[in-house]
Every structure is written in C-alpha cells, then in structure tokens.
Amino acid sequence: SPKAIAAIKAGLDDLHRYPEVVLGDFLRALAAHTGLELSQLVVGPGSDELLTRLVHAYAGPGDELVHSAHCYGKFPIYARMAGAAPVAAPDRDFRVDVDAVLSCLTERTRIVLLANPDNPTGAWISGAELRRLHAGLPDHTVLAIDGAYTDYVSDPHYEDGLALAAGANNVVV
C-alpha cells in the first residue's frame, strides 16, 4: 500500500539507530488500556522471562513460592531457579482452592503465583476469590497473577486482577 511504503521510507533515515529504549508510546498505550500508572508497568521479551525475573526479585534461598497443584509446569521451576522452595496448594476439582492456598502460607512465603485462567486446566478464579486471597496475604507476600489466557474468559464474574494491582503494592499481573 502507498501508506506502508511512505512509512518505510520515513523510517529509513533512522534504521542505523537503536530503538527507543523506554518504549514511551507503547507504555502510554498500555497504561491507557490497563488503567494502570506508567510507574506500575514493566515490559519484557515474554512472560517466561518476566516471571523468572519476578521470582528472582522477590524470592531466594530459604523462601517459598506457593502455587496451585495443577499449575503451569514452570511455576515450580521458577522457584527452584531462584533457590526457593515450591509449595503446591491442593486444588479442588482442578480449580484453585483459595482456602488451601492460604493454609500453605508461612513466614517464608514470598510469592503466591497463580495462572488466571489456569494453564493447563482452564479453570479461573473469580474476582471475589482473588480479593479474598489478597486480603489473606501477609504484607511480605506478593500475589503474582499470570494472565496469559485472560482473553479467553468471557464470564462476568472473572476479573484479570488489574484493578487489584492498581490499588495494591503487592500484586503483579
């Protein structure tokens, strides 16, 4: 298309330069889309890298990461990579059991990492249950929600956790 050709020609003068490091336009669009502040956003080369960095930032040797029993298979690996112990909270009918997650928390729990919706089961946690889980966390524990499959859920009781993250300093989505 003529517009595509014009855009390519317009960018030729800067091809030898590094791309914008701070991703300003992208981050502003992401903030507008999510309702979060720019200071609450972190982007990276993919969820695997971001989750690895998140776990390393908050957990280490002697710490614990709580996840659901039927979770994405790399969640316990992320914990071990950081030197932390993975703790599997029992599920109920292949769904996250918030009471079981809360009962697994100890002084050493630094992260509760859950996929919502879950991978591989597809089960999801309602907004009310997410808020109840968050309310039961000690101050030293981060609730990390992997929302890779959020767009597949259309039930009105589902919440992706962004509103929770907007108002809390220990929630990561």
Stretches found by the model and what they are:
Residues 47-48, 72, 116-120, 149-150:
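Short glycine-rich anion-binding loops that position phosphate/pyrophosphate groups of nucleotides
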Residues 80, 98-108, 120-143, 147-173:
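Active-site pre-lysine segment of PLP-dependent enzymes
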Residues 16, 24, 40, 57-114:
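PLP-dependent aminotransferase-like
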Residues 30, 75, 79, 137:
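Short hydrophobic alpha-helical segments of the AMP-binding
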Residues 4, 26, 50, 74, ...:
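Hydrophobic alpha-helical segments typical of transmembrane helices
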Residues 1-48, 53:
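N-terminal small-domain helix-loop-helix segment of the aminotransferase-like
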Residues 45, 91-96, 154-155:
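Short gly/ser/thr-rich secondary-structure transition/capping motifs
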